[in-house]
Structure formats: C-alpha cells, structure tokens
C-alpha cells in the first residue's frame, strides 16, 4: 500500500496508509462513514489517494433532521461517483423527543445502520479536536477512566471493527488538505448551534482555552491517550480477577470479598461491558459493591439494571437478563 507519488514525506496520505496497513489485510473491504462534512470527505479522498479505491465503499446515513438532508445525500453520491467509489445510503427516523437527547438519538440510529450495512470494517473521520471535545464532555459528566479514554482509534462493536485514521490529526490540517485539493463539502447548519453541548464546547470552551493554552487541544487528546492506557490496564486486572473468581457464568462471592472495594467495582464494570449492559450510576454501584462485601449468608443483594439484574445468592453472583 502506498500513498500518492506526489505526496511529501510524512504527508497525511502517508500516515493514513501506514495506519491502514498496520490494522488491515490487503483483501479487507473498507467502508467509510460519509456524512459529506469536511472530515469524512477528506478521509475518503486520502484513502483513494493511497491507492485503496478498489477496496473502498462509502455509507451515508440520511437522518432527515435538516431541510438540506436530501442535498447532502446527493452530494455524497456525486462525490463517490467522481472518485469511483461504491456508495450506499439509508434513511433513518430519529425521535426528536428521545430521552437520550437529539444528538445521542441520532448517533444511536447512525451506528445501528453502520452495524447492519458496513460489513466488517468501518472507517470514521473523527480527528484530534473531536477527541478533545469528547474528553471534556465526559469529564463534565463525571465519567470514570473508561469515559475519559474518550474516542479509541480502534474498537470492536460485536462483529464490526471501527477504525479512526484521522484521530491524531488536527482539524486545521484536515481543512488545509481539503483546500489544497480543492475539495467541496457540506456544512451542517446544526454545527453552529451552541445550544448543543458539543458545539458549545467546540466554539466557546475550547476556543477560550486555546487563547490561554495554545496547545490545549493537543494536550487534551494526549491525556485521553493516557486514560486509554490506564483503562486497558484496568481491563487486564479485571480479567485476572474474573479468572480467579469465575464459577461457570457466575462469580464466587468468597473471592469477591477478598478484593478491595475499587477492585471489586472495576470487576463488576468489566463484566457489564462484556455483556453490553449499561453501568449503573457510581453511587448505586458503590452501594451494591459494599453490600456484596458485607452481606451475611442469609442476605441476597441485587441490583436492577435496564438490561437485567445482578443477583447474589447460594455463594455466587449472577447476571440475569430480562426475558
């Protein structure tokens, strides 16, 4: 795999080519999530410049939230036609009154389409600015280590692998690439709405921080990388604790009571992630963990969650799904 012959050393195509070569095999198909915005337009162009055109396919999700949504889908289709890249599109209906909030509901709908239509390997255009925003957003929500790890460069969502080749790239470099190659893209008008949390962080909070700390974005993204390493270590520790306590699909209560409280909570979060269950609020998990450590044989602590329950009894802790 090689970048364009006209690319300078350590150019964006060179770095993306190296990223892809290190994580994929030559016969794997690459599906790019194409919104029509600058980031995904540049990502698709760079991948084509790397000589990967015959492996590429683009997938556009039509959310129907903007009066311009049809125009964006048409733009993406025409852009892919010019690049000689296969193009797929799918319409979704987003609940504007979702308890998740509009941003999160749209994201959930988008990723559901990705899971069904992207094949085995999906490439997304998140960049360093997105990483900094996500870290700030999660910190302000009181996230733990997993949340502050922010956006991973690679992760698996069931059978789907998700790669983000531009995650270490600054927004300014992406926009400069687009200008240098005379690329057009669409501007989502909602990106200027500071009533949306991420836009507020991008346009107001990070802008102010950058005025005082010019390296704020880079350093926040670097911190997210450190948190990611810490999260991986906690995962390894939880795996060891799981192996020491496992009894079929359950965990021995006697082994759990030998763990410190932070270590026990780490193990419970690890298991919930394995199952794809949402973790409870920190205070609820803390209280349940204390009950597991102190309850007598005649007590059966339980914690109800959206997907099921964690229930202690007969010397073990079990996870019981609903239905």
Q: Model regions: which residues?
A:
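AMP-forming adenylation/ATP pyrophosphatase catalytic core
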Residues: 2-39, 55-59, 63, 92-96, ...
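Core alpha/beta nucleotide-donor-binding catalytic domains of modification enzymes
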Residues: 2-207
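Alpha-helix boundary/capping and short turn/kink residues
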Residues: 141, 145, 210-214, 232, ...
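Mid-to-C-terminal catalytic subdomains of enzymes
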Residues: 175-225, 229-232, 300, 312-315, ...
């Amino acid at each position: 795999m090689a970048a364009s012959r006209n690319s300078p050393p350590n150019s964006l195509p060179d770095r993306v080519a190296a990223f892809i070569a290190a994580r994929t095999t030559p016969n794997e198909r690459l599906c790019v999530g194409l919104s029509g915005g600058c980031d995904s337009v540049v990502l698709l162009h760079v991948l084509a410049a790397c000589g990967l055109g015959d492996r590429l396919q683009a997938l556009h999700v039509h959310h129907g939230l903007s009066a311009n949504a049809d125009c964006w889908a048409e733009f993406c289709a025409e852009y892919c036609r010019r690049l000689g890249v296969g193009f797929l599109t799918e319409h979704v209906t987003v609940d504007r009154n979702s308890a998740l909030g509009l941003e999160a509901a749209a994201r959930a709908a988008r990723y559901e389409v990705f899971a069904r239509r992207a094949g085995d390997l999906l490439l997304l255009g998140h960049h360093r600015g997105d990483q900094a925003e996500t870290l700030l957003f999660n910190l302000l929500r009181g996230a733990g280590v997993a949340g502050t790890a922010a956006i991973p460069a690679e992760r698996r969502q069931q059978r789907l692998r998700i790669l983000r080749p531009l995650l270490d790239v600054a927004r300014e470099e992406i926009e400069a690439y687009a200008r240098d190659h005379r690329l057009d893209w669409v501007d989502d008008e909602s990106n200027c709405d500071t009533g949306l949390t991420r836009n507020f962080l991008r346009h107001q909070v990070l802008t102010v921080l950058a005025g005082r700390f010019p390296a704020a974005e880079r350093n926040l993204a670097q911190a997210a990388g450190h948190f990611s390493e810490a999260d991986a270590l906690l995962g390894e520790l939880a795996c060891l604790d799981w192996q020491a306590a496992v009894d079929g699909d359950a965990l021995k209560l006697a082994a759990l009571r030998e763990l410190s409280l932070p270590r026990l909570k780490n193990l419970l979060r690890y298991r919930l992630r394995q199952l794809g269950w949402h973790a409870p609020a920190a205070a609820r998990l803390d209280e349940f963990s204390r009950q597991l450590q102190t309850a007598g044989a005649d007590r059966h602590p339980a914690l109800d969650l959206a997907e099921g329950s964690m229930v202690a009894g007969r010397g073990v802790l079990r996870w019981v799904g609903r239905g």
